[in-house]
Amino acid sequence: MVTLDTLRREKKAEIIRLAEMSGCRNVRVFGSVATGENRSDSDVDFLVDLESGRTIFDLARFLGDLRDLLGAEIDVVESRSVHPHIRDRVLAEAVGL
């Protein structure tokens, strides 16, 4: 099971490296992993800022890289595209690595 502590202590450097390769900045975790309510089958939700000129293909690459690294289901959301109905909750939950 992926935990916030594991991400911070064991995977942070590699996650940041992968993010930079894909043009992702300000990597944060939100959802059940961030709140400590995750289970063994929980996915890991990442919130990122995408550099200008980057595309959805860069996000998809980052998502695939994270899936390979963590061995878990992953969601990657660009901060400007968070749905307005959940934006406040996502931003309140989001924690940096």
Model-derived segments and their meaning:
Residues 1-26, 34-40, 51-97:
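Catalytic core of pol beta-like nucleotidyltransferases
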Residues 29:
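Conserved histidines in hydrophobic membrane contexts and catalytic metal-binding motifs
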Residues 48:
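Structural signature of FAD isoalloxazine-binding scaffolds in flavoprotein oxidoreductases
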